[in-house]
Swiss-Prot record:
One of its GO terms (molecular function) is metalloexopeptidase activity. GO terms for biological process: proteolysis. It is found in: Vacuole membrane. One of its GO terms (cellular component) is vacuolar membrane. The record marks 329 as: Transition state stabilizer. It comes from Neurospora crassa (strain ATCC 24698 / 74-OR23-1A / CBS 708.71 / DSM 1257 / FGSC 987). CDD domains: M28_Fxna_like (cd03875). May be involved in vacuolar sorting and osmoregulation. This is Vacuolar membrane protease. Residues 606-617 have a biased composition (Basic and acidic residues). Signal peptide: none annotated.
């Protein structure tokens, strides 16, 4: 019966293919399928999924950016919804400013903050101005008036009363255990309905409020549910939180966000291990620390409120977000039609569980002095770095980075020592076959060294790996050169292409090499090379763990651990083979026995006709295994003696049973001195010797002149026969070598490979496949945003290698059927990937829209930004662009592959004012922006000049103020002052100020100051430009250019906003 796990082609092909398919198929299904929502509307008390979905459809009926009328309607709806929830739950609540004490002298369970007061002025970093006011890099600042809604749910252990007021109970402890924030933003972009960005976050936050205000669900520590406004343009709502009186008491947070349009909500990033412990036991965990480290290293530049909460306020928490498909992100397909209740439930269930864990932690996990002692940040204890990842979206692995560092260091130091120790032991036991090519025996030191096949196949693995890597990376580079965006719609085709070529090319080299020179050490050498390469990578991973606190290398830590154990098995299984000296002795004795048999039947033969000991050993090592012993028949001169196979005797020779003595061999054994006569002289005497033996004739053949070249009866007859018989019995007991491999390999356990593959394979396949797919999903549709087009291909390449590596030590045993099939698959997918159009109606290419007007001259341009190759065909479909010149240039705000293409937009003029205009003459926009800029010099200080600039814009909440010369000081009237938590005022001044009001048409008053300005030339340098934004496209005809785009662009294209405003109107001013 065939061993079902023997190291033979059939079992190896079957088990490896089965395990790969059994793991990869579920991983792909899980990656594509969102866990189903509960069938009941109320999965548990205090949560109503149907109600949440209805709220979502209500707030996503129209675009609702901060600078739109519908945004204000959404805000009113949310305030009413909060009140309805509290009333239905019977919770005692008050609005901020009312008395917190209710009946029976108890404090209200809930306080609602309708925040129309908080505002923030802060530095934003550098930019190159706006679209049509390009300058050298200048410092940006912002002034923003918030409209956040905050609901405080009092915890059981919270202080009573209005403890958050600065003058409340002076000297008393003020809610030292802190609060947990649940945050979501209710504004959308101007071109998206915001179902997942961030409508689902908003309705999830409402259900969190509903759950924790339901009877019996009061949290241990207080919870703040915040619905913030203004996140989309520059995280403004989170900046406004910094001015709220609850902010200093928030220790932990859960930020609910959307950077895709459905699917599962992933842990985008997290601050530490302790906050992840709160998330870890959700019903469907999803995420990996790799994503968090990618943010930390700057590989992902997308911003969420998490950045402000952590970097500015020092809070500890989690960013929970939707992240795919990116093609629908910020477009009109971010609606309820293109998402699901399953996605909503995935976020909602995780949010309630995590919030419950945060608020239920009454220990000191999130309390205490900060280790960095940073000024202005909340004292929320000491955190530790963590490592985390999910398995199949059902379980979650979480442990400390410090522990992984110790583990990595142990692997680096201990594992080489263990392998060196095993090698030393094998050498002492005379079983170190890996690094020994030949061996001599003490019994016959004069013999030629016996080859045992060590080092055979040693360099195959790195060569095969190099070839496979070359072909795979070449396919990636070819895609990037010929059709770089095919991954945008066909990422699985790219995955299959790379996996197929890597598998086939690696198999081709390894199988071919093993066919030409079979080696039983092939598998062991592959494991050894894997260990060496893994150890080198682990050095870099360990350094990053220690110096940069990067945990993303956990895959390589697990991989090297598995490789070490597999490598250890390859060394340990050598204990089952005979000693090298024993094997060599057997080969030499078999040789002697064959010499005896040949001469016993055939007389003396020419020494040149007899193969050397090395040739016999090599023949023995490469021939098929012997059959069962049979009774010897008299052989002819041209055939090997019966009872021998592959140069090794399997039955006693006839000489052992003959009543007559047989002639001894005269052929010299290699390595001995020989006095054998020449062929001619031997032929002359042969008949004479055979016919008449004398008293000088030796007992076993030959004659007196050949003494020195002969063995005695004792060394040739008895020892060879015993060894041959023993060898035959031993071969029957221990099995046969496989397909011309070294004969001693028949003693190796044929099942060891299976356990090696179980160590290397399943867990690494899971990690590589699901992590590779997750990272691919995160980036495969970012090329249209300006990201590097090669990035998704490099990710797929790296994880293709990691995916197939566990198979590589055994791949030479796989039958040709699988690799040949994959070669065909590679050819098909390569052809498709090279010629297919990269976009479709379900995977639309995103182009960025903007319209730009000079309100003084009426100059009007419509611009589309993206990859020029695809932007021009899009523009060609627009009626207003027909017959007009289209000019393109590199975009400064996007990547190097992105261009901005513009044409005259006079055919589609926007209607921006409060009242519709008819005809729109050249100067019809002149009254949209009113600027009054006056200068004054400080008394007694002629080196400084100040200016008061008043800006009023019709039907908008947003204008930018850009100066020719940066201002050395800046203040907004009625503003809260400069918030240095976001950075000190720049020494080289501020060149651009972004101004945001919470009301339409309200006037901004900006006080600016310059150094110098004593000459007319310097006065002129103090002039500038005002750029105002209009973003409300809900009423058809308001922005006809956008209406046209949504109607006429090809089905494979989508339109999204380029910047804060769909329309930007600019007007220059002089300070007088």
């Amino acid at each position: 019966m065939i061993n079902p796990i023997s190291f033979r082609p059939g079992p190896v092909t079957f088990w490896t293919t089965l395990i790969y398919l059994a793991l990869l198929i579920p991983i792909v299904i899980i990656n594509e399928k969102t866990p189903a929502a509960p069938k009941t509307a109320e999965p548990f008390k205090g949560v109503n999924l149907t109600e949440a979905w209805l709220d979502l459809t209500t707030i996503t009926r129209a675009y609702h950016p901060y600078n739109s009328k519908f945004n204000e309607e959404v805000r009113r709806y949310l305030l009413e919804k909060v009140e309805t929830i509290l009333e239905e739950n019977g919770a005692s609540w008050v609005s901020d400013g009312q008395m917190t004490t209710v009946k029976d002298g108890k404090s209200a369970a809930v306080t609602v903050f309708d925040d129309n007061v908080s505002n923030s002025t802060f530095v934003m970093g550098k930019s190159n101005g706006t679209t049509f006011t390009r300058t050298d890099s200048i410092n940006n600042a912002a002034y923003f008036e918030g409209t956040n809604i905050l609901v405080y749910i009092r915890g059981k252990e919270d202080d009573e009363g209005e403890w958050w007021e600065a003058d409340y109970a002076h000297g008393m402890r003020r809610n030292a255990k802190g609060l947990t924030l649940v945050n979501a933003h209710y504004d959308s972009v101007s071109t998206g309905f915001g179902a997942t960005d961030d409508g689902m976050g908003v309705v999830t936050a409402l259900q969190v409020l509903k759950y924790f205000t339901a009877p019996g669900h009061q949290p241990q520590r207080g919870i703040v549910v915040m619905l913030n406004n203004g996140e989309e343009d520059w995280l403004y709502g989170a900046h406004a939180l910094g001015q709220h009186k609850l902010n200093p008491f928030i220790h932990t947070f859960l930020n609910l966000e959307g950077a895709g349009a459905g699917g599962r909500a992933i842990v985008f990033r997290a601050t530490d291990r302790e906050v992840m412990a709160a998330y870890a036991r959700t019903s469907h965990p999803f995420g990996t620390v790799i994503a968090s480290d990618a943010f930390g290293l700057g590989f992902i530049s997308s911003g969420t409120d998490y950045s402000v909460l952590v970097d500015a306020y020092g809070q500890r928490g989690i960013d929970l977000a939707f992240f795919k498909p990116r093609a629908r992100y910020h477009t009109n397909q971010d609606d309820t039609r293109h998402t699901s209740k399953g996605s909503l439930w995935h976020m909602l269930s995780a949010a309630i569980h995590t919030t419950k864990q945060f608020s239920g932690d009454t220990g000191n996990t999130f309390i205490g002095q900060r280790p960095d002692k940073a000024h202005g940040k909340v004292a929320n204890g000491r955190s530790s770095n963590g490592v985390w990842f999910d398995l199949f979206g059902k379980s979650f692995v979480l442990f400390g980075l410090r522990g992984m560092f110790a583990w990595s260091l142990t692997l680096l130091i201990a594992t080489p020592l263990v392998l060196v120790g095993i090698t030393w032991l094998l050498r002492n036991l005379d079983k170190d076959y890996f690094f020994t090519s030949t061996v001599k025996t003490k019994e016959h030191p004069e013999y030629e060294a016996v080859p045992i096949g060590g080092w055979k196949g040693f360099f195959r693995f790195p060569f095969a790996l190099g070839v496979a890597v070359f072909f795979t990376i070449s396919s990636a580079l070819l895609m990037n050169k010929v059709n770089p965006l095919i991954v945008y719609s066909s990422r699985y085709s790219v995955w299959v292409m790379m996996v197929s070529i890597f598998y086939f090319s690696f198999w081709m080299i390894m199988r071919g090499a093993n066919f030409v020179r079979p080696s039983a050490l092939h598998r062991g050498y592959a494991n050894l090379w894997l260990f060496v390469f893994g150890w080198i990578v682990l050095v870099a991973v360990t350094a990053l763990e220690d110096r940069r606190r990067i945990a993303a290398g956990y895959i390589f830590v697990f991989l090297e651990s598995a490789i070490f154990l597999s490598c250890l098995i390859s060394f340990v299984e050598l204990l089952a083979v005979p000693r090298k000296s024993s094997y060599a002795l057997q080969v030499q004795e078999d040789y002697d026995g064959q010499e005896h048999d040949h001469n016993g039947y055939q007389g003396f033969r020419d020494s040149t006709d007899e193969p050397s000991l090395r040739a016999r050993a090599e023949s023995s090592a490469s021939a098929a295994s012997p059959p069962s012993p049979t009774v010897a028949q008299e052989p002819s001169k041209s055939k090997a003696p019966a009872g021998t196979t592959n140069g090794l005797s399997t039955a006693p020779s006839v000489a052992a049973h003959s009543s007559q003595p047989q002639p001894a061999p005269t052929t010299p054994i290699p390595g001995r001195s020989s006095g054998a006569p020449s062929t001619a002289s031997r032929d002359e005497n042969e008949s004479e010797d055979d016919d008449e033996p004398t008293e000088r004739t030796p007992l076993v053949g030959g004659n007196g002149t050949n003494d020195r070249g002969r063995t005695t009866f004792a060394t040739t007859y008895r020892r060879s026969i015993t060894a041959l018989v023993h060898g035959a019995r031993k071969m029957e007991e221990d099995g046969e070598p496989y397909d011309h491999e070294q004969e001693w390999s028949g003693h190796l356990p044929s099942w060891a490979w299976f356990f090696q593959f179980l160590l290397l394979g399943p867990f690494m396949i899971i990690l590589a496949a699901q992590t590779g797919l997750m990272l691919t999903d995160a980036v495969y549709q970012t090329g249209s945003d300006g990201s590097k087009l090669i990035t998704p291909y490099l990710i797929i390449f790296v994880f293709t290698v990691l995916l197939i590596l566990p198979l590589t030590p055994f791949i030479h045993r796989v039958t040709h059927h699988i690799p040949v099939f994959l070669l065909v698959v590679f050819i098909v997918t390569l052809t498709y990937n090279l010629i297919a159009f990269p976009f479709s109606a379900n995977n639309r290419y995103k182009t960025f829209f903007g319209q730009y007007i000079d309100v003084a001259t009426g100059d009007n341009k419509v611009c589309y930004t993206g990859i020029e190759e695809y932007v021009r065909p899009i523009i060609a479909e627009l009626p207003s662009a027909s017959g007009r010149e289209v000019t393109c240039g590199k975009s400064l705000r996007r990547g190097s592959t992105i261009s901005t293409c513009c044409f005259d937009g006079s055919a589609v003029p926007p209607k921006l004012g409060s009242e519709d205009d008819n005809g729109l003459p050249e100067d019809s926009y002149a009254d949209l922006i009113t600027i009054n800029a006056t200068r004054s010099t400080k008394r007694g200080d002629s080196s400084r000049t100040t200016a008061r600039i008043e800006i009023t814009a019709d039907n908008t909440k947003s204008c930018f103020l850009q100066f020719k010369k940066p201002v050395s000081a800046l203040a907004i009237e009625n503003g809260s002052g400069w918030d240095d938590r976001f950075g000190q005022y720049p020494e080289d001044g501020v060149g651009l100020v972004r101004l945001w009001h919470r009301e339409f048409g309200k006037t901004w008053v900006v006080n600016a100051e310059w150094k110098g300005s004593e000459t007319r030339k310097e006065y002129d340098e103090n002039d500038g430009t005002v750029i105002c934004m209009w973003s409300d496209a809900n009423t058809p005809g308001t922005i006809p250019a956008l209406d046209e785009a949504l109607q006429f662009v090809p089905s494979w294209a989508a339109v999204t906003k380029f910047s804060e405003g769909l329309v930007e109107g600019r007007k220059a001013f002089k300070i007088v």
